Each structure stands twice: as C-alpha cells, then as structure tokens.
Amino acid sequence: MTHQPSPVIHHHFAPAKINLGLSVLGVRENGYHDLHSLMVPLTVGDELEIRPAGALTLRVEGADLPTDERNLVYRAARAYLDAAGAAGGADLVLHKRLPLASGLGGGSSDAASTLLALAELYPAPDHRPVDLPALALTLGADVPFFLLGGAALAEGVGERLTPVDDLPPVHLVLANAGAEVSAGDAYRWLDETGDFSGKLRLEAMRLALARGVEVPYFNSLQAGVLARVPSVLTTLEALADAGLHSVLMSGSGATCFGLAHDAAQAQAAAAALAQRCPGWWVTAAQVRLPLSDNSGGRT
C-alpha cells in the first residue's frame, strides 16, 4: 500500500502595524474620513498556516472568532479563489497573537497575508489576472497597506499609499490593558466634536526619529477614546513611567506604544511593565524595515 505525501504546509507571518501619527482631516458626505497617516509594519503579529485542499476551511487558535464568512480571513480566501477561478481550496489555520479590536490592524493583516499566500499557492492564469490591491480594498481600507511589506504614507480613506523607505530603525513597546475599541466608535466620537486636524509634519517626524527625541506626531482619535476608555490613559502613563518617549495610541486604540532608544531599552521596559501590570498584553517590537521581499513574511 502506498501513502500519498501530505500537502506541504506554508507559513505566513501577518505583521501588526502602528500609526506613527494619525491625522483625520475631515469627513466626507458618505461618512468616510480623509486621513494622513504614517503606517509601519512591526516584528510582532499573527501567523497563518495554509495548505492546499479540496475545499475551504478555517480554524482559529488563540481567540474565539468565527470561522465562516463572518471572519475576514475566510472572506479574503473566498474572494481570491473566486477571482482566480481556482479549482481547489485551502485548509487555513490562523494563530492569533495580537489582541482583538486593538488598533494594530490584525484582521486586515491576516486578510492580506491570506491573499498573498493563496496567490502563491494558486497563481491566477494569464487570461484571468487578479488585481490584489483592488481585491484587498474590497475587504477593508487597511488591507492594501499590508500587501506592500513596508512603511507607507496613507491618504484618502487609507487607499492612497506612498511607500516610505527612509525611516531609521525604530524600537518600541506595545501595551494594551485589555480594552477593546471599535474603529466605528472611535471615528464617531471624533465626528461628534468635529475636532479634525491638519497633515502630519513628516520631515520633522523623520528627523526626531533619527535623533531619538520626542516625535511631533499626534492621533486625532486619541482624545475621544481617552474621554470614554480610561484604561487608555493609564496605558499611556505606564509607558511613559517605564522610561519610553513619544507615547501615543495606535489607530483607533486601545493599544498604545512608546519609543525606546534601542532594543535593549525596549526589552527591559517591556519586562518591567509586564511585571508591574499583570494581565496586560505587553511586548517589545521594532518597525519591520526593510523587508527583503513582498511575500507577507513567508517562512
């Protein structure tokens, strides 16, 4: 009796992101917001396992999430397979490492990694090309960013991306006290005040990052979240007390970050903060630049 070899399992890394500054310039008539944000991928994130199969299945480990059309990974896989006219499917296993609804783009990154993985597994035929960025945008405004594999200036509603490749090394600590904030709520709270902002000062930010001094960035969503989610202020204060600088909320929250001067300081601050705040999600990380390829972190 002969045994068929098991399908090869492909591993893809789905990096978290932070916003090194997020300016909301205004709101459109359709309810979408115009943004100006420096988005950067990090060395921490979720992991995706994928292997070819006859049908599409999804299993999630590390979080209680749906495994059908309600899950963005499943929708991304279904969208790509349909667009490419692929005859097969895939067994997907998502290992969640990032906290949910945390401002780190975890779901969007997972979806982008799914698209990249399936494009490698089931390349679209020449007569039926798949526009991955366009497909990604149908899944969410942040998803196209994660196809780039590097830092980018995001404009429009987040769909206009300009790669940024001249950032210095950036070391940081991420912390989340356990709160979840939906992006919809964060933007609604901003709309209630109408406190929109001007564009980020990118050159000043680059210079400050290179010098390791306080970075002149801001997050337009932060004030509204602070007024309603007290643990975010506690998190920002804890990061500053740990000796980190330029503390800021990432995206719509509730994860916050502070910058360190080097990897050693980041690791020490993360260890001290985790000990002082048991139950928090805390980790050291660095900006994932540059990437050697655009594979989404395949290993």
Curated annotation (Swiss-Prot):
Top-level division of the source organism's lineage: Bacteria
Pathway assignment: Isoprenoid biosynthesis; isopentenyl diphosphate biosynthesis via DXP pathway; isopentenyl diphosphate from 1-deoxy-D-xylulose 5-phosphate: step 3/6
InterPro entries per the UniProt record, alphabetical: GHMP_kinase_C_dom (IPR013750), GHMP_kinase_C_sf (IPR036554), GHMP_kinase_N_dom (IPR006204), IspE (IPR004424), Ribosomal_Su5_D2-typ_SF (IPR020568), Ribsml_uS5_D2-typ_fold_subgr (IPR014721)
Lineage of origin: Bacteria, Thermotogati, Deinococcota, Deinococci, Deinococcales
Keyword tRNA processing in annotation: no
Enzyme Commission no: 2.7.1.148
Membership in a protein family: Belongs to the GHMP kinase family. IspE subfamily.
Keywords: ATP-binding, Isoprene biosynthesis, Kinase, Nucleotide-binding, Transferase
Active site: K17, D142
The protein, known as: 4-diphosphocytidyl-2-C-methyl-D-erythritol kinase
Catalytic activity entry: 4-CDP-2-C-methyl-D-erythritol + ATP = 4-CDP-2-C-methyl-D-erythritol 2-phosphate + ADP + H(+)
One MF annotation (Gene Ontology) recorded for this entry: 4-(cytidine 5'-diphospho)-2-C-methyl-D-erythritol kinase activity
UniProt keyword Transcription regulation present: no
Positions of ATP binding: P99, L100, A101, S102, G103, L104, G105, G106, G107, S108, S109
GO biological process: isopentenyl diphosphate biosynthetic process, methylerythritol 4-phosphate pathway; terpenoid biosynthetic process
Pfam families per UniProt: GHMP_kinases_C (PF08544), GHMP_kinases_N (PF00288)
Main function: Catalyzes the phosphorylation of the position 2 hydroxy group of 4-diphosphocytidyl-2C-methyl-D-erythritol.
